[in-house]
Amino acid sequence: MSLLTEVETYVLSIIPSGPLKAEIAQRLEDVFAGKNTDLEALMEWLKTRPILSPLTKGILGFVFTLTVPSERGLQRRRFVQNALNGNGDPNNMDRAVKLYKKLKREITFHGAKEVALSYSTGALASCMGLIYNRMGTVTTEVAFGLVCATCEQIADSQHRSHRQMATTTNPLIRHENRMVLASTTAKAMEQMAGSSEQAAEAMEVANQARQMVQAMRTIGTHPNSSAGLRDNLLENLQAYQKRMGVQMQRFK
């Protein structure tokens, strides 16, 4: 796996699924391929994206700044600086300085990542802030190691949170989660369907699912009533894909 592929993988792992994730993936690919060289426009686009947390925007801004060639005098962006200040905690800043000194001795991506993984997310963000604000310099490879270590920590905590929700025994949470997943699957079906004539059937199935979820939420239903809802939708989606000649892995 190439270095940039690895960086893209880690960065995308912390972004919530949806159309915005696909858009960000495309931007990252363009940046890494050298196709997007307007850093200012890229940062302005990033700043106005909804949904993303300030830290995620900060990490993306840091990655864009590392990768896109820019004039020396180009101003640093406030939204990135604020996200990478370790919540203003002086302890984070102290640890960030210690980490920075260790990173200065590293020359490889993996070496930097290993060193960084033993620090807290706050310290890692602060260390990125030091480098972003030009208070310290490390090689691009080492900076990417720091980015990936931060993303790994964030993804780990997100995974724990998702796992807790997936394994919860609370029937109300499970019920709501099934309905949310059915809705997002329906949305994906509609987006994939496009405007072809064969798409009418998929659109109809997706629309029925949406209406069903809406009705269930409006009148309140037994927590078991949503069981199988998303599975049925996915089966319909797969059947539709086969007819359209599209092969996509079952996204369960």
UniProtKB/Swiss-Prot annotation:
InterPro entries: Flu_matrix_M1, Flu_matrix_M1_C, Flu_matrix_M1_N, Flu_matrix_M1_N_sub1, Flu_matrix_M1_N_sub2, INFV_M1. GO terms for molecular function: RNA binding; structural constituent of virion. It is found in: Virion membrane; Host nucleus. GO terms for cellular component: host cell nucleus; membrane; virion membrane. One of its GO terms (biological process) is viral budding from plasma membrane. Its main location: virion. Residues 1-164 are annotated as: Membrane-binding. The keyword RNA-binding applies. It is a peripheral membrane protein. The keyword Glycoprotein does not apply. It comes from the Viruses. Belongs to the influenza viruses Matrix protein M1 family. Most abundant protein in virion. When expressed alone can form virus-like particles in transfected cells. This is Matrix protein 1. It comes from Influenza A virus (strain A/Duck/Hong Kong/2986.1/2000 H5N1 genotype C). The gene is M.
